[in-house]
From Swiss-Prot:
Claim: Nucleus is one of the keywords in the record: yes
UniProt-annotated location(s): Cytoplasm; Nucleus
Protein name: Testis-specific Y-encoded protein 4
Species this chain originates from: Homo sapiens (Human)
A GO cellular-component term linked to this record: nucleus
Top-level taxon of origin: Eukaryota
This protein's record includes keyword Nucleus: yes
PANTHER family: TESTIS-SPECIFIC Y-ENCODED PROTEIN (PTHR11875)
InterPro entries: NAP-like_sf, NAP_family
Length: 314
């Protein structure tokens, strides 16, 4: 018999087998990629400098393929979480129905006595609701701990794909309309994006953008925080941008010349009207599965000259 108040989440056997299968597939892909990379590097040594660019392109493609597998694992974890929550809700609903059937309904009541009875039921219900909230919070924390190693691994692999986040942000259907050529150049110095969510005591979404040295600003990390409720993301805190003197005047001009919502205005002015829209896209869409917006580049063919931009794969 389970202790009173505890919840049991059963993961279906087909999901457990599918998760293990994804793990073995990712492990096999890593081993195969390592063997292919070794053979490719041996050829690169023989062919000289002309083979270096091809090797870099191949390694970047391997990293993107590995990201596919990591995203599959993250999706399996998310699916397990949904199934566990659904099964827990069904179990609690069935228990409530059985309890309701066991208690005889009240007889004819006056409005005054009905309100008194309703108050008594509500008082009894409050500790049950509190217990359910605690159980749900514990389950959510457990699933977040399971997701973390996959997200850490994804971040490490992304480091092997130059310009990954700039590519993803620029190719998002909604973000692309908000990005100028100058924004794209600024984003080309972005090396990583991280999103953290806190549920207690308030729901907070923290966006962290990491940059390498660039001609625009001195910051290595820019953090933006938003309070989240059912209807909106509300600006809470932002790291002040330390513009270089040579660009400070241009930054001021850009910020005041264009009053419409765009990436630069969101980036430079935390309280800009409509900036919560960009925050929501980053937190709820791009962070959860960035690979769906990544446009892969065709590696240069042997014997052809490499141009500044490789051809996009359709």
């Amino acid at each position: 018999m389970r202790p009173e108040g505890s919840l049991t989440y059963r993961v279906p056997e087909r999901l457990r087998q599918g998760f293990c299968g994804v793990g073995r597939a990712a492990q096999a892909l890593v081993c195969a990629s390592a063997k292919e990379g070794t053979a490719f590097r041996m050829e690169a040594v023989q062919e000289g400098a002309a083979g270096v660019e091809s090797e870099q392109a191949a390694l970047g493609e391997e990293a993107v393929l590995l990201l596919d597998d990591i995203m599959a694992e993250v999706e399996v974890v998310a699916e397990v979480e949904v199934v566990a929550e659904e099964e827990g809700l069904v179990e609690r609903r069935e228990e409530a129905q059985r309890a309701q059937q066991a208690v005889p309904g009240p007889g004819p009541m006056t409005p005054e006595s009905a309100l008194e009875e309703l108050l008594a039921v509500q008082v009894e219900l409050e500790p049950v609701n509190a217990q359910a909230r605690k159980a749900f919070s514990r389950q959510r924390e457990k699933m977040e701990r399971r997701r973390k190693p996959h997200l850490d691994r994804r971040g490490a692999v992304i480091q092997s794909v130059p310009g990954f986040w700039a590519n993803v942000i620029a190719n998002h259907p909604q973000m692309s309309a908000l990005i100028t050529d100058e924004d794209e150049d600024m984003l080309s110095y972005m090396v990583s994006l991280e999103v953290e969510e806190e549920k207690h005591p308030v729901h907070l979404c923290k966006i962290m953008l990491f940059f390498r040295s660039n001609p625009y600003f001195q910051n290595k990390v820019i953090t933006k925080e938003y309070l989240v409720n059912i209807t909106e993301y509300r600006a809470s805190h932002s790291t002040p941008i330390e513009w270089y003197p040579d660009y400070e005047v241009e930054a001021y001009r850009r910020r005041h010349h264009n009053s419409s919502l765009n990436f630069f205005n969101w980036f430079s002015d935390h309280n800009f009207a409509g900036s919560n829209k960009i925050a929501e896209i980053l937190c709820k869409d791009l962070w959860r599965n960035p690979l769906q917006y990544y446009k892969r580049m065709k590696p240069p063919e042997e014997g052809t000259e490499t141009s500044g931009d490789s051809q996009l794969l359709s």
